[in-house]
Amino acid sequence: MRIVFMGTPRFAELVLEELLQSDHEVVAVVTRPDAIRGRGKKLVSSPVKACAQRFDIPVLEYSSLKSEEAYQALINFHAEVFCVAAYGALLPKRILELPRFGCLNIHGSLLPRWRGAAPIERAVLAGDHETGIGIMRMEEGLDTGDVACTAVVKIEQKTASDLSDELACVGGKCLVSVLDKLDSGTEIHWTKQSNEGITYADKLAKG
């Protein structure tokens, strides 16, 4: 399948690496623009951009996908599905409706618990004993879509960083499994999220 991958941090990079080992074709990557980081105040590329460049994959850098420029750029890649992992911005309705098979999000929690930007960190801070990963069909609501291929991961004594790496690797494999089924026409069991147990994972303040 022709895929446009959207993501920014290391979590997304690990998912992208799993995807690149599959039979599917990543035709472009969308990531947030280079940002000034660290004590040296240097302009640094996102981990996803660096990964894409290693594999000579075209990179689009947008902090938002609301512009006509971004929309037209995505049309030109003729992708069948968009795969999103911690991109860092909401997708407008017309972007969600652009690819034939819609948009899939790799979300680092057992939805509907910890919807939002920082599900892994919030699970650790809350003292949760387990969390997980799921492949969600994206819609306009914040992490409200149907979910497939859920996997549970024990938190134990893991740091948020170690847990994030583990969830990304598991999530990448789940994503490939769902894409394989979409490509072959195999039925996928999508589960609607419960209206109970909803919590929100607000982004953590820096510092």
Regions found by a protein language model. Name each.
Residues 1-39:
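N-terminal Rossmann-like dinucleotide-binding module
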Residues 13, 17-21, 72-75, 93, ...:
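Amphipathic, non-transmembrane alpha-helical secondary structure
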Residues 22, 55, 98-99:
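Short, structured coil segments at secondary-structure junctions
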Residues 63-134, 138, 144:
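Alpha-helical oligomerization interface recognition
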Residues 140-207:
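Active-site-proximal loop/hinge segments within enzyme catalytic domains
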